[in-house]
Amino acid sequence: MTRTASFLIVAVSVLTASIAAGQETSRPPASLSGEWVLTTVVFGNERSERMNLQVEKGKVTGWVYRRRKRIPLAGKTDGVNIQFGIQDGDSKSSYTGRIVEGETSGKVTVTGGNPWGDEPPAGWHARPAVSERERPSAPRTLDFEPVEFHRVFSSSIKPVMRIWPGDTVRTRTVDAGGVDERTRTRVLGGNPQTGPFYVEGAMPGDVLVVRIRKLRLNRATAISDDGLVDRALTSDYAAEHKDTNFNDVVWKLDAEKGVATLARPTARLKDLAVPVRPMLGCVGVAPGFGAAPIRTGDSGRIGGNMDFSEIREGATLFLPVSQPGALLYVGDGHALQGDGELNGNALETSLDVEFAVDVQREKSLSGPRVENDEYLMAMGLGGSLDEAFREATSALAEWIEKDYTLTGPEAAILLGATIQYQISEVADRNVGVVAKVRKQFLPKGEPKKP
């Protein structure tokens, strides 16, 4: 069965400009060889993939990166017209187009199983991936002062800044209720985020590396409450405390001493002083092809509202990339949080944030990972503790098998003797379990590079 659709193809914006006698003129590209971003539009949704083209004497070869592997493509071009096909299982997509000043219109024919269902794609376009020649000569430190904050993780929000791997960003967040460092309400509550930041070169199938350089308190108060979430309680205890109203509890933050105390303590808690440990409740990227925006109170493969107390200064996060540029968001600052976020929130406050980014190419992950000087930590996020426990254990086992070249039995021996667990979050739709192992127990030498 063959389905053919005609549609606009903005082929590869490989527009080359020359300036002569003060006048800008355009000409067709000298070569199509190189790396591209191939985007297929399906029912108004864009699916972007890394594509590599090599052209020699009119012959086109290359691949697209899809489902953790490179799918070959082949075709031909005369410099004005281009044709290539992608064989993906039972499905073959044949692309044709005419190159005119870097833009092309054409058609695609899908033969065999159609990966998009009963209808063919509505269109496709491609552009050259960023060239290393465009990379700044040295990593930069960039300041970003947020004006707007967002309550969803989405690919449709315009990036606030384009940054390169190696760059460092200094910015700030509002608290979970939308209150800033001057105690002004800037946005509705619900974990509003700073961002998104577009990371050049990051593509679906890659891993975004986020290194948290600094987290600093920037105001003197935080807010929590006086209730425990039902998910953490027995039915008897919950019934006994059914009249709990989750009243706000105000904390005073002393950044110089590094402690938090109650602003209006009860007699029994008048001496309570706890050391602050600033952390980010939310670090996330945009969801992938066909996915609706994800609210900032939720978590999953994208990261998001993970509320894990080790996402703090000195930690490195690894997040699967699902959109070009990754589209990184940060927010939901906590001065301190106990495991599980049992109050339904933590010591909620605004923060000054400094982070750096990097990209690991073609190293797909099932979900978020965290690393610090002492531990490797794999997060499991699911609807139940059982599900999250299985996700976390499997993810950590896969991590040490692949990066430290261990066999399954070797990983089982190591984890059976050394694995530790934390319950990171029980307050939201997904619960979080973190499986972790001390790095001192891992095989010596550098882990395998992606």
Residue locations for each model-derived region?
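Intrinsically disordered, low-complexity linker/loop segments enriched in Gly/Pro
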Residues: 217-312
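Bacterial N-terminal signal peptides
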Residues: 6-17
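Short, structured beta-strand/loop micro-motifs enriched in basic residues and often containing a Trp
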Residues: 145-154, 186-193, 294-302, 396
